[in-house]
Amino acid sequence: MMGNQKLWGGRFEKGLEQWVEEFGASISFDYKLATFDIKASIAHVSMLGQQGIISKDEAELIKTGLEDIHRDILEEEIVFDSQDEDIHMTIERQLLAKIGPLAGKLHTARSRNDQVATDMHLYLKHILEALLEKLLQLRKVLVTLAEEHIETILPGYTHLQHAQPISFGHHLMAYYQMFTRDSERFKFNMKHTDMSPLGAAALAGTTFPIDRELTAQLLGFNELYHNSLDAVSDRDFIIEFLANASLLMMHMSRFCEEIILWTSYEYQFVSLSDSFSTGSSIMPQKKNPDMAELIRGKTGRVYGNLFSLLTVMKALPLAYNKDLQEDKEGLFDTAETILVAVDILAGMLSTMTVHKETMYRATQKDFSNATELADYLANKDMPFRQAHEIVGQLVLQASKEGIYLQDIPIKDFKAISPLIEEDIYDTLTSRAAVERRTSIGGTGFNQVSSQIALARKDLS
């Protein structure tokens, strides 16, 4: 390969026009695979030398050249040229300049099809390792915050209406469970990512006596693809990642939506650190939860990346097709988005101020204790449906009078049902309502403590 001559140019009488070439080039984004491409090439050439397909001296020269190129890339001494088409051609051109025609032996028993598939597996494995660590830290932040707020009480909502008072720690632990499931999904995703397609060649394997198990071992893969067609055609592991990322972003978006509400003037449940807020160019008083809004907004682009690749893959015949070039930008974008978003959310949570009294006061001027009264009557042998009807009438009456259940005089309670005693007022407090929810997984303080203890054990 001389100058910018294509790796595949021998069969053609003339080259592509520049604008067509630019349309087909992927170097503007697949340069992000450079480290992984060089790592895979070093493993491949080491195997070629070990198997006697090329001499060990030749393998060592090629390996040294690749290591030099990697250093040049890290030091930003290499300019990525769109005429190279992709990162593989860039590296091979650089290798040719460093060691001469011997560079051509690197591609022995290998195709760009298994080469790029290997790069993608290595890249995503790297991303998953980083993401799982970040999710672990986010979960630790949630557990620590939940432990601080086991006895902090706020309204629980259904339909965004006050439903029942709950522990703020309980609320936080709900998100801990979501992010734990996310972590489990990404761990399973790793199983399908931690596989080596290297050696599948274009689609049918190779006639050379390669050792695929050796290259898999050198690259740290746990398993081989056992069908060469599948090896170069498979993008399931990327789709799984994008689907899992969509679920993760959905969970973060839901949390951020609540944070946005909680920081509003109407709620004032929490205040975000200045480090995660911005202001207004015209309204001096504003402190906006922009980072939470951006996580909510960026969820849409992650969804889009998932559906984009699903659509690319839906009608592709085996094996490799140029359509598969479209697997990269969405993956890179999603990976970069979620890695930062997880850090942002962890940072917001670990630095935000929780206004306990405001949360508690929000449970005092509502009817979120109505279920307590219904349960109170049911515990005195009244059928729950009858109790529900009676309490509903009391809520209606109190609403008309501008009072709440705890404000109703005992004589009026007894007029509705003689089963109601003076102890009803203790039952109707928000704290009692929370403490009495002692079923497994409930919001009772002891149950929240149990959830946290289980989480601590899981995180250790």
Swiss-Prot record:
Its main location: cytoplasm. Disulfide bonds: none annotated. GO terms for molecular function: argininosuccinate lyase activity. It is found in: Cytoplasm. It catalyses: 2-(N(omega)-L-arginino)succinate = fumarate + L-arginine. One of its GO terms (biological process) is arginine biosynthetic process via ornithine. It holds the Pfam family Lyase_1. Pathway: Amino-acid biosynthesis; L-arginine biosynthesis; L-arginine from L-ornithine and carbamoyl phosphate: step 3/3. One of its GO terms (cellular component) is cytosol. InterPro entries: Arg_succ_lyase_C (IPR029419), Argininosuccinate_lyase (IPR009049), Fumarase/histidase_N (IPR024083), Fumarate_lyase_CS (IPR020557), Fumarate_lyase_fam (IPR000362), Fumarate_lyase_N (IPR022761), L-Aspartase-like (IPR008948). It comes from the Bacteria. Keywords: Amino-acid biosynthesis, Arginine biosynthesis, Cytoplasm, Lyase. Its EC number is 4.3.2.1. Belongs to the lyase 1 family. Argininosuccinate lyase subfamily. This is Argininosuccinate lyase. The gene is argH.
